[in-house]
Amino acid sequence: MKRKLIFLLCLLLLCFASAAAAQNLEKLGSTTSGDLYIDKDNIQPLTHDGRLFLLVQAELHYNEETLPKLQSLRPELRTAVEVTQIYMYNNDGTQYALLKSLYTDKDDQVVYSVDGTPELNPVQSRLQMLLYEKALSQLEEQKRIADMLKRKY
């Protein structure tokens, strides 16, 4: 049941991502593989069994050094230039799960898909923590704007 719920939420998040004409990406930093971006329009809170989680969509745009290595791993990845990943963080951001990875080509067509697992792992890198912090800040900003729009003048 938990897997089905998470799968449905991932699909929902991906639908929102596909529907957006222009993504609202913010660069978080660089890795040895490329540049990591957060999609500020695809952040969703989730409550399951009384626990709060945060779904976040991020993109890794591969650099020129990593692309040939990536593309040689599998025939399906020959044209891949970036990967869109959906993460699920626990309430305090100390644990995360990688739920889905979608490898896309230069035309944003999915060329390869990898399902993750809802198993939570400890956050171990600065960029993983920064991804959670930026997502939380964006969620707070969205709430603040929604509250402002609700006010009657």
Residue map of PLM features:
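Short, linear, compositionally biased motifs with a strong N-terminal bias
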Residues: 10-12
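Bacterial N-terminal signal peptides that target proteins for export
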Residues: 1-7
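N-terminal secretory-pathway/extracellular module detecting exported/lumenal segments
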Residues: 20-84, 89-153
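N-terminal signal peptide c-region/cleavage motif recognized by signal peptidases
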Residues: 15-18
